[in-house]
UniProtKB/Swiss-Prot annotation:
Function: F(1)F(0) ATP synthase produces ATP from ADP in the presence of a proton or sodium gradient. F-type ATPases consist of two structural domains, F(1) containing the extramembraneous catalytic core and F(0) containing the membrane proton channel, linked together by a central stalk and a peripheral stalk. During catalysis, ATP synthesis in the catalytic domain of F(1) is coupled via a rotary mechanism of the central stalk subunits to proton translocation. Component of the F(0) channel, it forms part of the peripheral stalk, linking F(1) to F(0).
Family: Belongs to the ATPase B chain family.
Protein name stated in the entry: ATP synthase subunit b
Coiled-coil positions: none
Transmembrane segments: 24-44
Keyword hit for Transmembrane: yes
Compartments (UniProt record): Cellular thylakoid membrane
Pfam family, one: ATP-synt_B
InterPro entries tied to this protein: ATP_synth_b/b'su_bac/chlpt
Glycosyltransferase recorded as keyword: no
Origin species: Synechococcus sp. (strain WH7803)
GO molecular function, a single term: proton-transporting ATP synthase activity, rotational mechanism
Membrane topology annotation: Single-pass membrane protein
Gene Ontology cellular component annotations, sorted alphabetically: plasma membrane-derived thylakoid membrane; proton-transporting ATP synthase complex
Amino acid sequence: MPLPLFASEGGFGLNLNLFETNLINLVIVIGVLYWFLKGFLGGILERRRQAILKDLEDSEGRLRQATTDLARAQEDLAAAQQKAEKIRSDGKARAEAIRKDGEMRTINAMAAVKQDALADLNAEGARLTEQLRREAALAAIDKVMTELPGRLDQAGQSRLIDASISNLEDA
């Protein structure tokens, strides 16, 4: 009985003859390729896998080192910022101390100038007062000397001389 599915009929069909379909040849070729390429490609893939693993381990090591370096750098930065802040605050304190010292020196210098001026003024006042006293005394003596001979008699002159001597003895 003829099978309508055979290729000899002119249509599409399934050829069950193993030798005509090269199925055995394909199985052999695929098997040989699998066996040959398994070792060859397996070695290549294994070497590639090892290289990738090594690169990953190196990358992880560099990442750990970079993380450590970053942490150290951040600590150094924080320390540097603290030091800079301390220097800045010390500078401000020093500037304030210098300013206050300058103010105190200026105040003291002004006080000294004022004291000197006051002392000069007092000395000049004392000198002028003394000069005025002398001039007043000389004027009074001149006036008395001109008027005295006409006003005093011999007894009055004696009393005046005795009173003057007694005043000189008390002083």
